[in-house]
Design a protein with these regions (language model features):
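Residue-identity detector for glutamine
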Residues: 17, 32, 80, 114-117
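Conserved, well-ordered alpha-helix/loop/beta-strand core segments that scaffold catalytic motifs
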Residues: 1-58
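Poly-acidic low-complexity segments
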Residues: 1, 51, 62, 98-103
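Generic hydrophobic alpha-helical segments
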Residues: 4-7, 86, 90
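Catalytic His-Asp segment of secreted/periplasmic serine-dependent ester chemistry enzymes
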Residues: 35, 39-89
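Conserved catalytic region of serine esterases and O-acyltransferases that act on ester linkages
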Residues: 87-144
Length: 144
C-alpha cells in the first residue's frame, strides 16, 4: 500500500499521466477485495484503473483455451487477446497513432512479423498442453 501511495504521489508531483492495468486473472474473494481497494486508491488519486476482468466479452475470452496453461493467469493465446484489446483501448482513449508501416518504424514492423510467427508456434504448443491436460493445477472457472 505504501509503495502505491508513493507512486501516486510521485506521479502527481511530477504531473505525469498513468494508466493502471489489471490483466485477466483467476481471483478468489480476498484477491478481488485487494484489487478493488487498489482500484479505489488509484481512482481517488485521479488516475484510471483498467480492470480487464470486466471486459471478458470484449476480449473474446474462451476460458477453456485462454487461461488453461501454467497457472491462474492468461496463456499466450489469452495474452494476445489482451494485447489487441489494450492497444485499441489506448489508441481510442489516449489518441496514440498506429505507426505500423511508417518510415522510421521498420524495426517495429519486423519485430511484429517475428512475433506473429512465434505466436502461431505458441498456439500449437498451448493447444497440445490443453489437450494433454499438461498444465498447472490452478482451477480456472468462468465468473458468474
Amino acid at each position: 500500500e505504501e509503495c502505491l501511495r508513493n507512486l501516486l504521489e510521485y506521479l502527481k508531483e511530477n504531473d505525469l499521466q498513468a494508466l493502471f492495468i489489471l490483466s485477466p486473472t483467476v481471483m478468489e474473494e480476498e484477491k478481488q477485495k485487494m484489487y478493488n481497494y487498489i482500484e479505489d486508491m488509484v481512482n481517488a488519486s485521479g488516475y484510471e484503473f483498467l480492470n480487464m476482468n470486466d471486459y471478458y466479452e470484449e476480449l473474446g475470452f474462451d476460458f477453456a483455451a485462454d487461461f488453461s496453461d501454467y497457472g491462474g493467469h492468461v496463456n499466450g493465446v489469452g495474452a494476445q487477446k489482451c494485447t489487441a484489446f489494450l492497444s485499441s483501448y489506448i489508441a481510442k482513449n489516449y489518441g496514440l497513432e498506429d505507426k505500423r508501416g511508417e518510415m522510421g518504424f521498420e524495426s517495429w514492423d519486423a519485430a511484429y512479423e517475428q512475433w506473429k510467427q512465434e505466436l502461431e508456434e505458441a498456439k500449437k504448443t498451448i493447444a497440445k498442453h490443453i489437450e494433454e491436460k499438461d498444465f498447472a493445477d490452478a482451477p480456472v472457472e468462468e465468473p458468474e
